[in-house]
Amino acid sequence: MERAGPSFGQQRQQQQPQQQKQQQRDQDSVEAWLDDHWDFTFSYFVRKATREMVNAWFAERVHTIPVCKEGIRGHTESCSCPLQQSPRADNSAPGTPTRKISASEFDRPLRPIVVKDSEGTVSFLSDSEKKEQMPLTPPRFDHDEGDQCSRLLELVKDISSHLDVTALCHKIFLHIHGLISADRYSLFLVCEDSSNDKFLISRLFDVAEGSTLEEVSNNCIRLEWNKGIVGHVAALGEPLNIKDAYEDPRFNAEVDQITGYKTQSILCMPIKNHREEVVGVAQAINKKSGNGGTFTEKDEKDFAAYLAFCGIVLHNAQLYETSLLENKRNQVLLDLASLIFEEQQSLEVILKKIAATIISFMQVQKCTIFIVDEDCSDSFSSVFHMECEELEKSSDTLTREHDANKINYMYAQYVKNTMEPLNIPDVSKDKRFPWTTENTGNVNQQCIRSLLCTPIKNGKKNKVIGVCQLVNKMEENTGKVKPFNRNDEQFLEAFVIFCGLGIQNTQMYEAVERAMAKQMVTLEVLSYHASAAEEETRELQSLAAAVVPSAQTLKITDFSFSDFELSDLETALCTIRMFTDLNLVQNFQMKHEVLCRWILSVKKNYRKNVAYHNWRHAFNTAQCMFAALKAGKIQNKLTDLEILALLIAALSHDLDHRGVNNSYIQRSEHPLAQLYCHSIMEHHHFDQCLMILNSPGNQILSGLSIEEYKTTLKIIKQAILATDLALYIKRRGEFFELIRKNQFNLEDPHQKELFLAMLMTACDLSAITKPWPIQQRIAELVATEFFDQGDRERKELNIEPTDLMNREKKNKIPSMQVGFIDAICLQLYEALTHVSEDCFPLLDGCRKNRQKWQALAEQQEKMLINGESGQAKRN
């Protein structure tokens, strides 16, 4: 029984796909003809286009730019420089700070840490005005025993609520007067000078019945330690009860001679703190009544009892004054720290602020800061000088020319060499510095009396970077010059720590600024030389303006494309056609001049002395990407930004390739190896890509919004890094597994990123898919580059290269190619074909070339066997 032929309906169904394919070929031919005959196309559009067609043309080319918070335009300057755009990686790993205050202590109602002064300036230093205190109750002078207890309680109450040493001691003396009835009372406090030598200063002098606090506290008398009655009591810590002062050899009658007062009997007692240290001396003079005008044992007991209260008062007051002083010091140091880290741009400005702070706080006449010359340690590179009269001025320059010669460098030089502070109470009496004799007798304002000089060290404490010199500490009330004391030394020692930090930070900032300025100049010069020549740009622009052949005419949509017959200028025209046909020029408002210059600049930055990884390889990678997008039907799976980034990445992925791989860069200890921990050359290629994109006249991304710009750069970087085969091998397993399980989804952002990386590798390796004659020729170029690297490894690194790089193993190329296809290529193109069946030509070409290389490998093996057997027969 004969089989019936196909019905008419079946024949019609079979003919329809053939007619559709023929119709598509006719349309492609017409479109290619129109692209090649632009004058006719333009004339036809002008004559035949309707309003609907024009509106549709506009609607097709409207590029919607999302509004972002940072702004739509004008980002090319702020984001143009990769150095400015890349955020700094935070590699710091701070340890757990030492707890210095418990969490519960923060809940205590303390004063605010940061306060505002009367002018509204934020400061750590609180207002110095004291809170108003309750006035002292006047003493009562009842003589009965019961009332003495009430007076003691009253005195204890005053001591617990007041910290004014002078007022409290004055009241204590008035209480004492009611018991021992002396004519005069005096209070002397123990002090120390800068040399830790003790002396006595009167806090109350000649307190008498009816005297006021102001009268007895104005006179200030200094007594030497262990001299006179008071000095002797202070030194020994034992009381003295003297009946006749003039009969005691320790008595100094000079005060009587000055005041005209006649001293007869003296009761002098030490005032001690809880550690039994003498902190003061109290003196009662001339017993008024009873016992022949001399002080009795009862007077001594009563005097000692009340002086115990004076000891408590002095101790509490000293603790309070010390805490206030430390608090003020810490606040000043905090203000200084804030000042230092607020200003780091100018060394002169920060030193002016430091000097002004020191002069204001320490009440000195002059402050000079010497900066050590880094190149010559025996001299100073700069000197900053300020005087107290300049505090109210707003001068920006500290050192004036007419003052420079009056600054004495000798003390600073001495301190720099010894690395120890120097405190001279009176320079005219110091025997260590003979040059100071020139100041003797000089009473003008330029005279140096007291001096404090401290080294400024760096953070490691082993190098002096400067010296701070203070001249003439002034009395706050009288303006007289006085010596610097130990407290001044300690404060300045803490002060210069912050000064050292400020100086170091500012010097580092200035050094970084200079380095950045040099880098900017270098980048400017590099950008100029990296950019294409203007004549070449104008030539390409004029050719592109006249006519750019269609993609079909140029055959750049074919996976079997070859560039061997094209000139460099023609490859640039092909690149323009790729950007045009992918609608990138229209969608992102690219200027033709800028696009032409960018393409030529990219071409220029590929090294011509590299056999394979040059401009032609980059162009072929971009052509394969274009063919995959167009003929492989991948374009409709991607966004416009992704297409733009992929094409830029394909053209730029091997910029400035040196003809060697990452392994050679690492083993040769090339400076590039110090910049990146992996994918060394790929990171360098991306940096070169950024440099060209941001060079003047090459900014093809200037039409993007800020968010689009950031997104595009991110995709470009990921795509270029994906061409590192080490990363490809690491990530391909996940991609292949998704394809195998039929779970691949381009809507997933991570899978989309993974697919773009695989697509970049497929295009980068596309030479393995070309027709056999093209594949053979490219393989020779690759082998030439690899063998050149092997020669360099032997010569420069003194190592034996691998077979892939070994010129002596050239006969193994076919077998190595087969191994490369099996290990790297085949599975990739199989997976890509699963994503888009129209990419099958890549897989087919790869399989055919494997067969060719396999045949050559077998032939090579037979020749090797035959050669060995023939050699054996001859032997």
From Swiss-Prot:
Zn(2+) binds at residues 617, 653-654, 764. It comes from the Eukaryota. Binds 1 Zn(2+) ion per subunit. Binds 2 divalent metal cations per subunit: site 1 preferentially binds zinc, while site 2 has a preference for magnesium. Tightly binds zinc. Binds 1 Mg(2+) ions per subunit. Binds 2 divalent metal cations per subunit: site 1 preferentially binds zinc, while site 2 has a preference for magnesium. Binds magnesium less tightly than zinc. The gene is PDE5A. Residues 10-22 have a biased composition (Low complexity). Keywords: Allosteric enzyme, cGMP, cGMP-binding, Hydrolase, Metal-binding, Nucleotide-binding, Phosphoprotein, Repeat, Zinc. It comes from Homo sapiens. This is cGMP-specific 3',5'-cyclic phosphodiesterase. CDD domains: HDc. Residues 164-314, 346-503 form the GAF domain.
